[in-house]
């Protein structure tokens, strides 16, 4: 066995070396104590240096946000599982504000308001982060709305057009098709995405606030089937989430979208819906004992939405020329758009599309009320071809609605009024559109051209949609150059209009109504020339489909 020898000199040298390299390293850490907790809110004692909107760390890695800074305590919103937060637990400062990871890794994913994936497809690889509370672009950092954002919905693109960088409110009662309008708009961006041109591509962010889980799953499935998830991110705060998550969700979606906007890209963001967002913020404010105002909402509920929607903008060329277009949704009760939250958001946005229950129940879908709907800045972004054909559409429909109510009481009408009623009925039928079937703008121009130029006046109302579909199919198959010219030039020249009129008139000769009649009035038959004698001519008419 080896003998153990201890050298006093070695021990002395080790101690001297340790003392020479010793440095006092003190850490200052503020620790608070939970004095009460419940309903997603916690009051914390201590932490005298905490800042508003600062992240706090509760036991178990649960995060909270400091909202109320009182003299002796802090009111914090707990983000996540608040059931395990108890009185007496310690709370630490983080010195950070809320931020989320951002980047192209989010495309095609479903995340929660903290930016964490919840679709079971693994982690999201990102390198950048962005704070949730950021100042909106200033006046000098913006430019006017000039590029169209096509929704693929005839009634919107023709009457209340939307431009890139605009905020267009979609408002209406529950079950009137608000979400369907936004989903169709996202689906319509697929053609632009497939071009691969960054100037045409539009990335989409769908923020679901307080929606049922089945509704969010249905939207995701629709987008996947339409090939739209390749360029879409879903931020989900379902009804089962705490009020804190519902309050944060729109800001998370905006942070993800703003990253792309400042990178020179174009983004469409949908907030579905801001009524539930305001209600979640009201719940938080009341639990924090903030003084209630009108309808028990806190005094800063206007600022809650204005600072969110002001982030939507068309940036100046110096900042890359990116854009963020916002489609906030608001749910009304009994079509009352003069309530507190609806009037707030109407005053913030650049226009609104009002969806009406009565129209929806009559089968007019999308159920857009032309009289109340307006787009304040989108007209500058509308393509010239659509401006030319849809110029009188809004007036015609407004006159039709007015005459329709009058005609219910009048026994006889003059010829002009009858003509307006007949054309109005056909225009209403023309603007109907099935869900999840957005239409390219060049096809919309041709369809609206049929109605406003009087080509449908001889077509029975029940045959209008079939006439439109068969004509568009005819143009696609034999006169594709019409669509190509409208798509590329974005104009309807006199020559093109004449060509289109000739195509429509020729098509009408072979179209049969459901009752088997022609839509072309009979003309006086001229005498047959000698050259045509003993010659055969065959005319093919496409029969109307049999009624089931």
From Swiss-Prot:
It is found in: Cell membrane. Its main location: membrane. ATP binds at residues 172-179. The record marks 373 as: Required for activity. GO terms for molecular function: ADP binding; ATP binding; proton-transporting ATP synthase activity, rotational mechanism. InterPro entries: ATP_synth_asu-like_sf (IPR023366), ATP_synth_asu_C (IPR000793), ATP_synth_asu_C_sf (IPR038376), ATP_synth_F1_a_nt-bd_dom (IPR033732), ATP_synth_F1_asu (IPR005294), ATPase_a/bsu_AS (IPR020003), ATPase_F1/V1/A1_a/bsu_N (IPR004100), ATPase_F1/V1/A1_a/bsu_N_sf (IPR036121). It is a peripheral membrane protein. Keywords: ATP synthesis, ATP-binding, Cell membrane, CF(1), Hydrogen ion transport, Ion transport, Membrane, Nucleotide-binding, Translocase, Transport. It comes from the Bacteria. Disulfide bonds: none annotated. Residues 523-534 have a biased composition (Acidic residues). The keyword Transcription does not apply. Its EC number is 7.1.2.2. Residues 511-548 are annotated as: Disordered. It catalyses: ATP + H2O + 4 H(+)(in) = ADP + phosphate + 5 H(+)(out). One of its GO terms (cellular component) is proton-transporting ATP synthase complex. Belongs to the ATPase alpha/beta chains family. Produces ATP from ADP in the presence of a proton gradient across the membrane. The alpha chain is a regulatory subunit. F-type ATPases have 2 components, CF(1) - the catalytic core - and CF(0) - the membrane proton channel. CF(1) has five subunits: alpha(3), beta(3), gamma(1), delta(1), epsilon(1). CF(0) has three main subunits: a(1), b(2) and c(9-12). The alpha and beta chains form an alternating ring which encloses part of the gamma chain. CF(1) is attached to CF(0) by a central stalk formed by the gamma and epsilon chains, while a peripheral stalk is formed by the delta and b chains. This is ATP synthase subunit alpha. The gene is atpA.
């Amino acid at each position: 066995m080896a003998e153990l020898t201890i050298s006093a000199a070695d021990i002395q040298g080790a101690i001297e070396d340790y003392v020479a390299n010793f440095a006092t390293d003190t850490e200052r850490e503020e620790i608070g104590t939970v004095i009460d907790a419940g309903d997603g809110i916690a009051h914390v004692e201590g932490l005298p240096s905490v800042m508003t909107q600062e992240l706090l760390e509760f036991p178990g890695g649960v995060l909270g946000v400091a909202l109320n800074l009182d003299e002796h305590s802090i009111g914090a919103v707990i983000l996540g599982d608040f059931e395990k937060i108890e009185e007496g637990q310690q709370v630490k400062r983080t010195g950070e504000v809320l931020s989320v990871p951002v980047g192209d890794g989010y495309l095609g994913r479903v995340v929660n308001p903290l930016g964490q994936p919840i679709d079971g497809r693994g982690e999201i690889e990102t390198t950048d982060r962005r704070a949730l509370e950021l100042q909106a672009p200033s006046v000098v950092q913006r430019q006017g709305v000039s590029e169209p954002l096509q929704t693929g919905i005839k009634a919107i693109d023709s009457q209340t057009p939307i431009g890139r960088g605009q905020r267009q409110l979609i408002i209406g009662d529950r079950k009137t098709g608000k979400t369907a309008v936004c989903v169709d708009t996202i689906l319509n961006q697929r053609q632009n995405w497939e071009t691969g041109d960054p100037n045409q591509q539009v990335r989409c962010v769908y923020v679901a606030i307080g929606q049922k889980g089945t509704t969010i799953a249905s939207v995701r499935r629709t987008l996947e089937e339409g090939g739209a998830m390749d360029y879409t991110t879903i931020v989900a705060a379902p009804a089962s989430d705490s009020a804190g998550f519902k309050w944060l969700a729109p800001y998370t979606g905006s942070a993800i979208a703003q990253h792309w906007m400042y990178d020179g890209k174009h983004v469409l963001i949908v907030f579905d819906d801001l009524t539930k967002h305001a209600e979640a913020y009201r719940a938080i404010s009341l639990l924090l004992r903030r003084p209630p105002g009108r309808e028990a909402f806190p005094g800063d509920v206007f600022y809650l939405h204005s600072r969110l929607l002001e982030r939507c903008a068309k940036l100046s060329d110096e900042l890359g020329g990116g854009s963020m277009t916002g489609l906030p949704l608001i749910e009304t009760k009994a079509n009352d758009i003069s309530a507190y939250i609806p009037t707030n958001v109407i005053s913030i946005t650049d226009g609104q599309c009002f969806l009406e229950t009565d129209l929806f129940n009559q089968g007019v879908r999308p159920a857009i009320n032309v009289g109340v709907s307006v787009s304040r800045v989108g007209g500058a972004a509308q393509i010239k071809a659509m401006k030319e054909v849809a110029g009188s559409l809004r007036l015609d429909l407004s006159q039709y609605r007015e005459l329709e109510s009058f005609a219910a009481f009048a026994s006889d009408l003059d010829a002009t009024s009858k003509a307006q009623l007949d054309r109005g009925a056909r225009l209403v039928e023309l603007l109907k559109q099935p869900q999840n079937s957005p239409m390219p703008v060049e096809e919309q121009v041709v369809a609206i051209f049929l109605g406003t130029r009087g080509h449908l006046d001889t077509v029975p109302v029940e045959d209008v949609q079939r006439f439109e579909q068969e004509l568009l199919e005819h143009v696609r198959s034999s006169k594709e150059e019409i669509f190509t010219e409208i798509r590329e030039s974005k104009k309807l020249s006199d020559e093109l209009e004449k060509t289109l009129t000739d195509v429509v008139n020729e098509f009408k000769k072979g179209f049969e109504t459901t009752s088997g009649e022609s839509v072309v009035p009979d003309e006086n038959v001229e005498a047959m020339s000698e050259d045509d004698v003993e010659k055969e001519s065959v005319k093919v008419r496409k029969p109307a489909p049999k009624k089931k």
